[in-house]
């Protein structure tokens, strides 16, 4: 028979409340310890935080006192190159870019005259090559405090070109929108509203049209002259696919300056311009314009920094003089987007001045040459304007208006 444990044995244990009091009454002098004793003779190693990139940069250079006491050393070519380049892009995909030289940096346009011209253009649904081609001189040409000094090169026949030159940022399409029949009238209205004395008209190439847009161009010039006959008009045209009759039509429409850009040397033309634009064809356009109206000033522009050679540039200037071109401009090619040709060289202002003098020595009437000079740069226009007025028997207002000082940027 199983033994029975007496239940009353638990009555001999102290009450639970009393037990808790006894525990609380135990002196606290005793200290808790880990089950495994720690050897305090060995110091605990300190884990250093990974230094940041900023701290690395700070620690890599001398202190201020050390820096002041360092002897001056000339920059090595490697140091100079490092200052001209920068690494951009996300981690793992960084690439090296070349910073723009100081002489190519321009202010951001933001003043009342710039805003007014832009508002007028939008209201009349007009386009400018200044915006479409991302011209660096837009703050200078649009932002002048003197209204008569402001220049905006109106781009006719829309903002979409049928050609795709590798240096130009204008939109391209095989089938651009149809021409706006009201554009000639709107253009004449805008130019008369601004009160300018000298205007520049250009256009996209329209190979989709039978006449290349020559009649539209000529109509616009005639409308401008009807509104204000004293306005001097420069037309920067395409090559009309080599149709010299269309060149003659525009040249005889009443303009004062016929411009067509060569863009580069003969050897680089196939790599820089659209395959339909040919070096010899452009020379024939300038020659045909001069023959159609000998009193016209003919003008062209060449970009530097594309990898051209000195001898090729000399040959281009000689070719232009053979067809009696009066004015040439030199400017720095600046890559508009990553889709376009890379800049081979940033040409210094001193080299631009050398080519300006060489052009004048060859017999050109005028040459504007500088990193920021473009084919319709206002410094050149001021000089041409006074040449035209002089031919018409108008007194030149001032020596400053010739723009000779502004020609070299």
UniProtKB/Swiss-Prot annotation:
Its EC top class is: transferase
Which residue intervals define the domain Radical SAM core in the entry?
144-365
Q: Where is the transit peptide?
A: 1-34
| Compartmental location | Mitochondrion
Which pathway features in its UniProt record?
Protein modification; protein lipoylation via endogenous pathway; protein N(6)-(lipoyl)lysine from octanoyl-[acyl-carrier-protein]: step 2/2
* Catalytic activity line of the entry: [[Fe-S] cluster scaffold protein carrying a second [4Fe-4S](2+) cluster] + N(6)-octanoyl-L-lysyl-[protein] + 2 oxidized [2Fe-2S]-[ferredoxin] + 2 S-adenosyl-L-methionine + 4 H(+) = [[Fe-S] cluster scaffold protein] + N(6)-[(R)-dihydrolipoyl]-L-lysyl-[protein] + 4 Fe(3+) + 2 hydrogen sulfide + 2 5'-deoxyadenosine + 2 L-methionine + 2 reduced [2Fe-2S]-[ferredoxin]
Under Pfam families, the record lists: LIAS_N, Radical_SAM
The entry's protein name is Lipoyl synthase, mitochondrial
- Reported cofactor(s): [4Fe-4S] cluster
User: Can you name a GO cellular component term?
Assistant: mitochondrion
* UniProt cross-references to NCBIfam families, sorted A to Z: lipA, PRK05481.1, PRK12928.1
Residues involved in [4Fe-4S] cluster 2 binding: 161, 165, 168
Q: Which residues form a coiled coil?
A: none
Similarity comment text for this entry:
Belongs to the radical SAM superfamily. Lipoyl synthase family.
Where is the organism placed in the taxonomic lineage, from the top?
A: Eukaryota, Fungi, Dikarya, Ascomycota, Pezizomycotina
| Cofactor annotation remark | Binds 2 [4Fe-4S] clusters per subunit. One cluster is coordinated with 3 cysteines and an exchangeable S-adenosyl-L-methionine.
GO BP annotations listed = lipoate biosynthetic process
Give the species this sequence originates from: Sclerotinia sclerotiorum (strain ATCC 18683 / 1980 / Ss-1) (White mold)
Per the UniProt entry, the Enzyme Commission number(s) are 2.8.1.8
Q: Does the keyword Mitochondrion apply?
A: yes
Which keywords does UniProt give here?
4Fe-4S, Iron, Iron-sulfur, Metal-binding, Mitochondrion, S-adenosyl-L-methionine, Transferase, Transit peptide
InterPro entries for this protein: Aldolase_TIM, Elp3/MiaA/NifB-like_rSAM, LIAS_N, Lipoyl_synth, rSAM
Q: Name one GO molecular function term.
A: lipoate synthase activity
Residues that bind [4Fe-4S] cluster 1, according to the entry?
130, 135, 141, 376
